[in-house]
Amino acid sequence: MKAVCVLSGGLDSAVCMAMAKSEGLELYSITFDYGQRAVKKEIIASKKLSELFGAVHKVVELPFVKDFSSSALTKKEEEVPTIKNSELDNLEKATETMEKVWVPARNMILFSISSGFAEFVDAKYIYTGLNVEEGATFPDNTEEFLNRFNSVLEYGTLNKVKMKSPLYKYSKKEIVKIGKKLEEKLNVEFLKYSYSCYHDNKTDFLHCGTCESCMRRKRAFKEAGVEDPTEYIL
């Protein structure tokens, strides 16, 4: 049975892909270039992860997305927001930073294209790494969004491909724990090849350590009691 993994190269999508691999599925992966700052590093990470899990990897360029986005992820003149560790669970602050990196209808666009790719390769499932931590502020990272999108797929695809997000109830800490167990089960070290940073840093897999995504990654490994293999600038 085939599955397509929506792969940003980040921690969540990497663990999600490992889960699909552990289920014995034939894997395809799809990564999107929509003009985001870290796209080069995301593609490098996604290619490496795809190699590790034996997935057929495809990169899709979507240059038009940045043309109607004022997000700090796609506009270099906009400053990427930072957040203190003590503010990560502050809903008001997290919502404020979310709005600065929000790309209009991003998941709607990416998931729609992933659905077309899945139908083309006759995949039964699409795996994506939605999680409860990001779902607290990003409306397109929620269980409700997932369920409603699946309802659309029943009418929008002939093979009625279904989107799965096995991590949507888990926090980043729990995702790290799941990832570590999967490394042991699959005998593949993959967590160190994931890339979470919002920035395009000088070397592959080097993280800034100060953007919100890096801060959540740091905290997740620390709280999970798992050694963090990530190299941070700060």
Curated annotation (Swiss-Prot):
It catalyses: 7-carboxy-7-deazaguanine + NH4(+) + ATP = 7-cyano-7-deazaguanine + ADP + phosphate + H2O + H(+). CDD domains: QueC-like (cd01995). One of its GO terms (molecular function) is zinc ion binding. Pathway: Purine metabolism; 7-cyano-7-deazaguanine biosynthesis. The keyword Cell division does not apply. ATP binds at residues 7-17. Binds 1 zinc ion per subunit. Keywords: ATP-binding, Ligase, Metal-binding, Nucleotide-binding, Zinc. InterPro entries: QueC (IPR018317), Rossmann-like_a/b/a_fold (IPR014729). Its cofactor is Zn(2+). Zn(2+) binds at residues 197, 208, 211, 214. Its EC number is 6.3.4.20. It is an enzyme of class 6 (ligase). NCBIfam families: 7-cyano-7-deazaguanine synthase QueC. PANTHER family: 7-CYANO-7-DEAZAGUANINE SYNTHASE (PTHR42914:SF1). Catalyzes the ATP-dependent conversion of 7-carboxy-7-deazaguanine (CDG) to 7-cyano-7-deazaguanine (preQ(0)). Belongs to the QueC family. This is 7-cyano-7-deazaguanine synthase. It comes from Methanococcus aeolicus (strain ATCC BAA-1280 / DSM 17508 / OCM 812 / Nankai-3). The gene is queC.
